[in-house]
Amino acid sequence: MKFLFDLFPVILFFAVFKWGEGNADAAQAFGQQFLSGLVSGGQVTVTQAPILLATAIAIIATILQIGYLLSRRKKVDGTLWLSLAIIVFFGGATIYFHNETFIKWKPTVLYWCFAAALLFSQIFLNKNLIRTMMEKQMSLPDGVWRRVNLSWVAFFITMGLLNLYVAFNFSTAAWVNFKLFGGMGLMFAFIIIQSLLLSKYLKEPQ
């Protein structure tokens, strides 16, 4: 359930964009009605409507995520606050300037923030964030923990670069598909490969 909860804004972004693509006139009318006051010039065109509506929904969904957790008196992870700040800034710029370039940078900025946090904590704070999250499930030598942490740094940097490559070398529709299925698929593959490599260190249930 937590996995689906975390993916909620991404899934809605994908669904609204696809709906907008298939219902261009309705999407343009809807965007003009609800977003015209937020865009520079006050006009939402047929070609712009799908990405602008999807971006607006992603911002709202992320705010609702945090609101739900706060209403249930649950802890809001720092990563979710970071995601909110980035989606509001880059998504807001996309809507105001009706320019999809900003929202296409959002995943890369988020990936690179994760990489920077992992690397900074290990080098300057002598704290391994991956170890903090995973040490209850497995016991690894210090050197292995460092390599696992650095492997995540490399993964996030690579994902950020890959996002930019797809975003600016393929159509927006292709990028939206990659954002959900490509990003999720590569994340799953990385986790599975890493889990297989580290399986010998898994703690036996008591």
UniProtKB/Swiss-Prot annotation:
Recorded superkingdom: Bacteria
Protein name, per record? Inner membrane-spanning protein YciB
Q: Name one Pfam family in it.
A: IspA
Q: Which InterPro entries match?
A: YciB (IPR006008)
| Keyword terms | Cell inner membrane, Cell membrane, Membrane, Transmembrane, Transmembrane helix
Specify where it is mainly localized: membrane
Protein source organism: Herminiimonas arsenicoxydans
Subcellular locations according to the entry: Cell inner membrane
